[in-house]
């Protein structure tokens, strides 16, 4: 059993699809902490989140120069 100790990220759009970029830290029963990018997870009981909604849409585009999907704020 793990407990989420931190979850932070953003939700944007890429090619009209929802794009989640999230970092997670979680601890085990021995108090070891693990972290990294959240790709998939299943919540067995509860997970309390605060989501701040901004006006407009934030899109991502692939940047060939650095090889990452970056915000396009234009």
Question: Model-predicted segments: where are they?
Answer:
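Mid-chain, well-packed structural core segment of small domains
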Residues: 1-38
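Flexible glycine-rich active-site/ligand-binding loops centered on an Asp-His dyad
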Residues: 17, 36-74
């Amino acid at each position: 059993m793990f407990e989420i100790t931190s979850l932070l990220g953003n939700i944007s759009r890429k090619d009209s699809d929802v794009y989640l970029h999230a970092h997670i830290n979680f601890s085990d029963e021995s108090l070891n902490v693990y972290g990294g990018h959240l790709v998939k997870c299943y919540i067995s009981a509860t997970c309390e989140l605060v989501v701040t909604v901004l006006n407009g849409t934030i899109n991502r585009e692939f940047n060939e120069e650095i090889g990452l999907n970056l915000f396009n704020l234009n």
